[in-house]
Design a protein with these regions (language model features):
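Substrate-binding cleft of extracellular glycoside hydrolase catalytic domains
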Residues: 2-111
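Functionally critical loop-and-helix segments that line ligand-binding/catalytic clefts
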Residues: 3, 131-180
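Hydrophobic anchor at the start of a short beta-strand
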Residues: 43, 114-116, 138
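Short secondary-structure transition/capping segments
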Residues: 56, 60-63, 86-100, 120-129, ...
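Aromatic-lined carbohydrate-recognition surfaces of secreted/lumenal glycan-active proteins
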Residues: 108-126
């Protein structure tokens, strides 16, 4: 993977069950982070949220930090907020979702890590109060030849259909404008 020119990876650390609300460690997390760090690839993490309140967001952030301990995490720990099939958080208002995201990010920051938010361009416009997220790393997903998000952003996910030698299947492709 490193030989393909990949110099950073954002690895899923875990997620909250869409229906049950249970916290689940990604079954490939340890293998993925160990492989990336062994290859000299800088890593960040993301947690796929289905938190419906601040307390659940703090639980998610705490789990992510607990699993991150012992690894060199130089990129942010992101909260991934998007719609899920029958997702328990799908019906949150824009303001309630923003409160959840801020609680996650502040917990991550209080734990000594960089904090960030991952969402699509339309999600930032319609489901989050993006102006309330200043100070956190903003990672925008927009599968296009250029990112047209008008707000400040630090990373851009431009494809979900990338190919990287050493990884089976499609890979999300990203550009980081900050070195971390």
């Amino acid at each position: 993977v490193a030989a393909s020119g990949i110099n950073f990876a954002i690895i899923r650390v875990g997620y909250r069950g869409s229906a049950s609300g249970a916290l689940i460690q990604d079954p490939n997390f340890k293998k993925n982070i160990s492989g990336a760090t062994k290859a000299g690839i800088k890593v960040g993490l993301y947690f796929f949220t289905q938190a419906v309140n601040e307390a659940e967001a703090v639980e998610e952030a705490s789990m992510a930090m607990s699993l991150a301990s012992g690894y060199k995490v130089t990129y942010p720990i992101f909260i991934d907020t998007e719609s899920a099939s029958s997702g328990r958080a799908n019906g949150l208002s824009k303001s309630a979702r923003t409160v959840v995201v801020k609680a996650f990010c502040q917990t991550i920051r209080n734990g000594g890590y960089k904090a960030g938010v991952y969402a699509s361009k339309s999600w930032y416009a319609n489901q989050l109060n993006a102006s309330a997220l200043n100070g956190y790393c903003i990672w925008v997903a927009q599968y296009n030849s250029s990112c047209t998000y008008s707000g400040k952003y630090d990373m851009w996910q431009y494809s979900s259909k990338g190919s990287v030698s050493g990884i089976k299947g499609n890979v999300d492709m990203n550009i980081s404008y900050t070195g971390y």
